[in-house]
């Protein structure tokens, strides 16, 4: 880039030249110091951080929370939604992206509880749905939850993972795109070790 910009927003997310590029462009056209790159990201990022928030709000032995946590930790949350509502997704060529949009509408949107997306989510996770709606109402701002989860995401990425990467891998150059970290391929094993350690213990 002949001009590089970066700015942290009010919720801790870093915006740069890289964040405005499509994933395919970053993957197929960018290098770091002439070296091939790859990225690692948080599976089902926003639902993952919601699961961490819910541990303080629900009984951790609750079967619904256990299922939700297992799905997001294994990156299977959107697949679970698709599996239970095949008719809703049958006409879409990118079902996972559609399931992600559905989830974001429920968690972060100014949508009513009677919307089809809300009813689908509530059918699978009624207690978690009630918590989400309750937070929106109690805070008087439907954006509160999304802002909180973005702050948690930023703390995880920058406060923990990126911080440790720079401490443990001398001379490495990386860039981030919200919940993902891109690095030279030669550092794969060490970066993955650091990332997985924080992910497991968060």
Would you name each region that the model predicts?
Residues 19-143:
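Helical catalytic core of nucleic-acid polymerases
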Residues 93-94, 186-190:
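Short, basic interhelical loop/turn and adjoining N-cap
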Residues 41-42, 103, 172-185:
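Catalytic palm active-site di-aspartate
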Residues 1-21:
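Extended, Lys/Arg-enriched charged tracts that mediate electrostatic binding to polyanionic substrates
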Residues 155-177:
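Active-site palm subdomain of RNA-directed nucleic acid polymerases
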Residues 188-202:
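Polymerase palm active-site segment centered on the conserved acidic dipeptide of motif C
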Residues 141-159:
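Adenine-nucleotide phosphate-binding core of ATP-dependent small-molecule kinases
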């Amino acid at each position: 880039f002949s001009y590089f910009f970066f700015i942290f927003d009010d919720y801790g997310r870093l915006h740069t030249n890289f964040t405005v590029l499509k994933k395919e462009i970053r993957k197929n056209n960018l290098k770091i110091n002439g070296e091939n790159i790859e990225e690692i990201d948080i599976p089902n990022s926003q639902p993952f951080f919601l699961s961490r928030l819910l541990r303080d709000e629900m009984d951790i032995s609750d079967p619904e929370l256990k299922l939700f946590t297992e799905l997001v930790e294994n990156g299977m949350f959107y697949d679970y939604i698709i599996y239970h509502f095949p008719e809703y997704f049958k006409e879409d060529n990118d079902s996972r992206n559609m399931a992600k949009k559905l989830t974001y509408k429920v968690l972060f949107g100014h949508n009513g509880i009677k919307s089809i997306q809300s009813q689908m989510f509530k059918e699978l996770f009624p207690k978690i749905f009630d918590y989400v709606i309750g937070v929106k109402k109690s805070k008087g701002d439907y954006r509160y939850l999304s802002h909180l989860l973005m702050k948690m995401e930023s703390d995880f990425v920058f406060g923990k993972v990126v911080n440790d990467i720079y401490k443990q891998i001398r001379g490495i150059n990386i860039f981030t795109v919200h919940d993902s970290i891109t690095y030279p391929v030669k550092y794969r094993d060490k970066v993955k070790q650091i990332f997985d350690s924080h992910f497991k213990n968060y």
